Amino acid sequence: MRSSSRCYCAPEKDPYDYWLSEYEDGLTMAQCDEFFATLREHIVPLLRKIKAQPQLDDAMLHGHFPEEKQAQLSDYLMRTMGLDLDHVGLATTEHPFTTSLGSHFDERITTHYLEDNFASSMFSVIHEGGHALYDTGSADDLAYTVLDGGVSMGIHESQSRFYENLLGRSRAFTGFVFPKLCELFPELAGHTAEEFYRAINKAEPSLIRTEADEVTYSLHVMVRYELEKRVMHGELKVHDLPAEWDRLYK
């Protein structure tokens, strides 16, 4: 349907170019192809080099971390990030996301809690909190207009991942937050902030994009891009997607 509708909206354009530009103004396949090729050229050798080294120990991230304690951590993180909790709410879902209801005055973020891994929710909240900070930073006179809530999804994701990775996984922030983690989860008291910093920055291939580390995250996006491009050009049928997904991930 997406490919067909392009025939009426912009018949002179490639269907995927049309929808890329609708999603991110001015974005083209040529730009994506060049960008991902450069990224792949550097990420794949880097990942091989990492895998050849002794692996970091992230056992401290796994254990039993009660959901109610993780919820307290979420509240602490949101307040620490400077979110106005009078206008930003938190709920639980399977897949974390952020949305506005009507305007940036009513912002909703979600997370999920895994009782065997508190870091999953911790970084989801920081990530979604980055989205919410960008949304709630919109000018009040733009509320309830199409300009409310940010310039583009590309900028939006840059803000969320800036908070999640450049700040949230930094040595400075992990050192700051570690005493609170030990307060909520006493079993961490036998570890150090430096051990926590190293554990949350462990790089290894995974199947879930939202759980991916900073090195391998972009590989998940590349797979989705290649599949979507082929579907839009009629080179891959939707019912064949699961098998092709499995092949590319292997």
What are these regions (language model features)?
Residues 98-106, 132-139, 194-202:
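Active-site-adjacent bridging/hinge elements
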Residues 1-118:
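Contiguous, non-catalytic segments that form substrate-binding/exosite surfaces or channel walls
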Residues 10, 111-115, 120-140, 157-164:
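Active-site recognition of the HExxH zinc-binding catalytic motif
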Residues 149-189:
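Post-HExxH zinc-binding segment in Zn-dependent metallohydrolases
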Residues 35, 66, 101, 105, ...:
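Secondary-structure capping and boundary motifs in well-ordered enzyme cores
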Residues 172-250:
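Long, amphipathic alpha-helical stalk/connector segments used for oligomerization, subunit docking
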Residues 54-60, 107-115, 139-146, 207-212, ...:
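Glycine- and acidic
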Residues 26, 49-60, 139-146, 167-178, ...:
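Inter-helical turn/loop segments and adjacent helix faces that build the functional surface
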